[in-house]
Structure formats: structure tokens, C-alpha cells
């Protein structure tokens, strides 16, 4: 049997670190997930071992808080954008070897604290759904730059099936996603 729960009861939210592009490099101490790069090459997942595009680095002299370090299965969430349509993009962070990685400016880390109730991959799909994004947008503030505060996201209630069902749903959605990616790649080859 599932349950209805507020995100803030099962997740913590942390703001990313502000590092300008001029201080990003091809090599360094930490991988750095820059907000602008999320829209150009990543879709639902950020796989550190096999990234869709190169991930830049920052040096160890940057002022980084421990809360800005990404952990495997965190969700990198976009809560600031120049358009309302770009709010609410979610990216599951896959980093099984725990390479040191920092979440960047204008991103929010969503960390699942209750994995006995929530499968991070399931939550990532849920947070990417049109229904969730509609709910999220009711909290939008701003005129030129649009924002949603993490405390507002924490108030959003979600229905959770049992974790076994969440795993089954993720397996189905992952298979569909993989097929879509393969088709996109094939279409890219055909149009070239």
C-alpha cells in the first residue's frame, strides 16, 4: 500500500555553488554541473561515467560547501530560469564511483533521505512529469527571471506506491527512454 507525503518529509534541498564559466576547466579537482550545460546535452540523467557531453571541472580553491557536493542518485533540479517553461527540469545524477562533483549555480540538489519510501529514479521521473511541473509552477515568482523556492517544492505532496512498484515503473520508463534515445541517435545518423 502506498502513501501520500510532502516532498520535504522525504527529501532535503540544497542550493548549488556559484562559479562562473571563466573558472571552469578541462581538468581540475571537482566536476561541475553548470546550469547552462543542462539544457545542451542532458536529458533526465547525468551519467558521470558516460556523460552525454563533457562535464567541466573547477579547481579546489573554490569556496564550496559540503551541501553543494552531489552524491550518487541525487536529483539536480532547475528552479531558476529566464522562461517559465524551463522551470522544473530534473536530472538524476548517476555517479556510482563517487567522483567529486559540485552542483552549480541556479541548480538545487534534491536528496532523498527516505529511500525506504522513495526510489530516487522514480522521484526524478515524477518530478519531470507534466502534472508535477504544473503544480510546481503555481509557486513561480519573478518578472524577468523566474524562480521557485525550495521550501515551496518541499510542500508539494506526492502519491507514492510501494518501493517495489516504484522500481517496476522505473524499469518500464527506463526501457522507453533507452528506446527513444536509440531512435534519436538513429534519426541523427539518417539526417546527416
Q: Model features per residue range: what roles?
A:
Residues 34-36, 60-128:
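A short beta-sheet element
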Residues 1-18, 155-192:
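Non-catalytic DNA-recognition/assembly elements of restriction-modification systems
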Residues 29:
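Short aromatic-glycine-enriched beta-strand elements
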Residues 19, 100-108, 140-170:
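A short glycine-rich beta-alpha junction/loop motif
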Amino acid at each position: 500500500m502506498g502513501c501520500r507525503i510532502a516532498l520535504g518529509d522525504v527529501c532535503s534541498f540544497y542550493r548549488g555553488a556559484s562559479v562562473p564559466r571563466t573558472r571552469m576547466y578541462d581538468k581540475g579537482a571537482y566536476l561541475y554541473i553548470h546550469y547552462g550545460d543542462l539544457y545542451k546535452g542532458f536529458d533526465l540523467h547525468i551519467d558521470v561515467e558516460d556523460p552525454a557531453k563533457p562535464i567541466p571541472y573547477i579547481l579546489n580553491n573554490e569556496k564550496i560547501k559540503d551541501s553543494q557536493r552531489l552524491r550518487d542518485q541525487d536529483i539536480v533540479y532547475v528552479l531558476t530560469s529566464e522562461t517559465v517553461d524551463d522551470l522544473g527540469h530534473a536530472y538524476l545524477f548517476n555517479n556510482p564511483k563517487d567522483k567529486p562533483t559540485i552542483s552549480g549555480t541556479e541548480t538545487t540538489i534534491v536528496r532523498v533521505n527516505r529511500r525506504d519510501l522513495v526510489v530516487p529514479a522514480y522521484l526524478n521521473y515524477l518530478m519531470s512529469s507534466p502534472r508535477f511541473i504544473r503544480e510546481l509552477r503555481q509557486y513561480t515568482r519573478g518578472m524577468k527571471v523566474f524562480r521557485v523556492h525550495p521550501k515551496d517544492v518541499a510542500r508539494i505532496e506526492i502519491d507514492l506506491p510501494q518501493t517495489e512498484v516504484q522500481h517496476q515503473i522505473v524499469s518500464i520508463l527506463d526501457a522507453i527512454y533507452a528506446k527513444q534515445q536509440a531512435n534519436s541517435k538513429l534519426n541523427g545518423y539518417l539526417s546527416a
